[in-house]
């Protein structure tokens, strides 16, 4: 299947694996790209050295194009951009709103720029900067998310910009791909569906929690930004807690990261992105990585936060990335044939 996305980045199928922190490493990104989709390394939760090693790890596994996701507000964002350019990364994506100078540098070096947005005005802004495409995530999506459903947000963005639009939030099968194409998108991006594959490095015990899950909630207790996560006793305790738990979690992250309290507070304040946050939320924003890492790396579902889209309630298997992508494309072809039938 050829779309504006496949033509732009050189992948075989219009399917993107999103850059999920502590989930999308070299193994998952390479498996996705090798299967014909576009795999994206989640470098926002990596050091520069780890990011460079992950890029090398993908290169060792596949010659297919792939992307790297970074936080453009990070102190070392410019350094990361130079690494991506030097290593010949095909696609740059952004966990949060990119800085224009980073976009200009990447585009000048021939890197395809694809930021993620959650509102039409944000899509219009980055399109005016000259980005190559946008991923637009509706409220069904996991992690940082907005209040508008994909079915309402997607057509708004498609109508508002003249660049390829990739749909995210609520997608998991071929029917969704066809629906996104009908709305005017050039492909779909999936996070939770790729998290629940055999190629994902998420611990098996955590995958079992996802497969058994039936509910998510949107909380601001993680970092002050609306965050869709699995509903767990730990998350419900975060919803009830205030400064004390933030300080306790912050102390743990301080030990792991080596940051001083002053550095943690500066990090938390930077992650506010102009919002008014309580001190508890500032500290939570600074130690968000430890909450994600606890579950996604250490396997502590009881002490961590597990970002998840609403699709988690309908997922019940762990296919390989190749099996997943081939299934989605087969389903899409079947649906399109049915629609073409008299």
Protein language model annotation of sequence segments:
Residues 21, 168-174:
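Gly/Ser-rich catalytic serine loop of serine hydrolases
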Residues 96, 138, 169, 192-194:
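Short, structured patches in soluble enzyme cores that scaffold and shape functional sites
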Residues 150-162, 172-342:
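Conserved active-site-proximal phosphate/metal-binding subdomains
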């Amino acid at each position: 299947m050829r779309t504006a996305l496949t033509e732009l980045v050189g992948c075989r199928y219009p399917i993107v694996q999103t850059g999920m922190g502590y989930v999308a490493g070299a193994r998952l990104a390479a498996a996705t790209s090798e299967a014909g989709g576009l795999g994206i390394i989640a470098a926002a939760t990596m050091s520069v050295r780890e990011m460079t090693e992950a890029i090398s790890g993908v290169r060792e596994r596949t010659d297919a194009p792939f992307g790297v996701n970074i936080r453009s507000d990070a102190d070392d964002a410019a350094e990361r951009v130079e690494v991506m350019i030097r290593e010949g990364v095909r696609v740059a994506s952004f966990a949060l709103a990119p800085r224009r100078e980073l976009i200009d540098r990447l585009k000048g070096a021939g890197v395809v720029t694809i930021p993620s947005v959650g509102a039409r005005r944000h899509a219009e802004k980055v399109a005016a900067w000259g980005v190559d495409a946008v991923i637009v995530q509706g409220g069904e999506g996991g992690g940082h998310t907005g209040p508008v459903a994909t079915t309402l947000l997607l057509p708004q963005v498609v109508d508002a910009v003249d660049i390829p639009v990739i749909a995210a939030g609520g997608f998991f099968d071929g029917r969704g791909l066809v629906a996104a194409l009908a709305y005017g998108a050039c492909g779909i991006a999936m996070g939770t569906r790729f998290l629940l594959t055999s190629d994902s490095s998420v611990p098996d015990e955590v995958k079992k929690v996802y497969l058994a899950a039936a509910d998510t909630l949107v909380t601001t207790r993680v970092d002050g930004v609306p965050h869709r996560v699995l509903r767990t006793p730990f998350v419900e305790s975060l919803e009830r807690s205030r400064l004390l738990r933030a300080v306790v979690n912050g102390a743990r992250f301080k030990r792991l990261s080596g940051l001083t309290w002053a550095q943690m507070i500066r990090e938390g304040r930077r992650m506010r992105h102009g919002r008014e946050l309580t001190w508890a939320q500032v500290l939570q924003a600074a130690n968000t990585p430890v909450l994600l890492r606890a579950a996604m790396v250490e396997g502590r579902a009881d002490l961590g936060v597990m970002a998840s889209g609403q699709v988690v309630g309908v997922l019940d298997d762990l296919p390989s990335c190749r099996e997943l992508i081939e299934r989605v494309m087969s389903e899409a072809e079947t649906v399109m044939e049915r629609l073409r039938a008299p």
